[in-house]
Amino acid sequence: MALTSRLATPADLPALTPLVDAAIGRLLSPWLDAAQVEASRAIMGVDTRLVDDGTYFVVEDDGSLAGCGGWSRRATLYGGDHTEGRDDALLDPATQPARIRAMYTHPDHTRRGVGRLVLQLCEAAAAAAGVTRVQLMATVAGRPLYEAA
């Protein structure tokens, strides 16, 4: 296993959609029923604003897309391009935490350090941009990662 990381580009977007769909469907299903998983798809997904802002990472495992996630200076805490109520307003880093956003690990790559690497990349990049605090909203499937961090 050789994990590599880089900033996501618009060319990555077509490959991210099936990764996110697999993560939502397979990783949440132990805790949620089918209707709840479908409802999760309505509020979760990739926010291309993060890619445009240069704050979204992809992680590959031996060349295979294994995970993704980012951070944001914007007010939106969660949601993909299709999610209603997103807010692109810029946060004040002196008084407001940046957001850790849209973190997904492909189910075939869980428990291999992918999520931890994405989180570390996000925290380091946010700190380099002058951010002193971050916040996130987690799913029940992601909670163990964030509690261990």
Model-assigned labels for residue ranges:
Residues 1-14:
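Conserved N-terminal entry element of GNAT/NAT acetyltransferase domains
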Residues 21-46:
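Conserved GNAT-fold acetyl-CoA-binding loop/helix
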Residues 119, 126-139:
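Conserved GNAT acetyl-CoA-binding A-motif
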Residues 109, 113-121:
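Conserved acetyl-CoA pyrophosphate-binding loop and the N-cap/start of the following alpha-helix
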Residues 47-53:
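Short loop/turn motifs at secondary-structure junctions and domain boundaries
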Residues 110, 134-145:
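Conserved beta-strand-loop-alpha-helix junction that forms the acyl-donor binding cleft
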